[in-house]
């Protein structure tokens, strides 16, 4: 399993407060940190991917982080007149995009690594149940719960 990240929450806050560009920048920073953690061995799962597919591992880290921050900002912008709803949808969007791009990369450009890790288990089952399953649900739940706090931060900052 991949580690659960709480880093998406500050990315969403930045995207909501300062727009999609800021969300993308924070997401890119998250991607860089994730890639470095994998390269250095701090994150064993990412390191395993890096050993088997260095270019695509780094590219996936950078793209998924950047895209989740940008998407959260765009979604918030689309719904911003309804602050609480906008924050909820933006907060849910980030883990969906982050995990979705990871899954897409694993099923396409890093499929060889996925097959190696699955060790004979059906790759779709392995990816979505073993690797992503609980992680995604926890991240989605945390972001949903914290979206009200994000909305409150936006209200307070917006009044200044």
Task: Describe the role of every protein-language-model region.
Residues 1-160:
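Loop-helix junctions at membrane interfaces
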């Amino acid at each position: 399993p991949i580690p659960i990240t709480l880093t998406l929450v500050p990315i969403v806050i930045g995207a909501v407060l300062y727009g999609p560009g800021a969300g993308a920048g924070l997401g890119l920073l998250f991607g860089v940190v994730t890639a470095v953690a994998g390269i250095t061995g701090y994150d064993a799962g990412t390191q395993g991917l890096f050993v088997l597919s260095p270019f695509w591992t780094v590219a996936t880290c950078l793209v998924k982080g950047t895209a989740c921050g940008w998407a959260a900002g765009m979604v918030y912008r689309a719904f911003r007149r309804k602050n609480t709803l906008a924050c909820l949808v933006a907060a849910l969007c980030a883990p969906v995009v982050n995990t979705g791009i990871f899954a897409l990369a694993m099923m396409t450009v890093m499929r060889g690594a996925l097959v190696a890790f699955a060790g004979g288990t059906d790759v779709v089952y392995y990816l979505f149940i073993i690797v992503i399953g609980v992680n995604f649900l926890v991240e989605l739940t945390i972001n949903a719960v914290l979206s009200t706090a994000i909305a409150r931060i936006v209200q307070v900052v917006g009044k200044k």
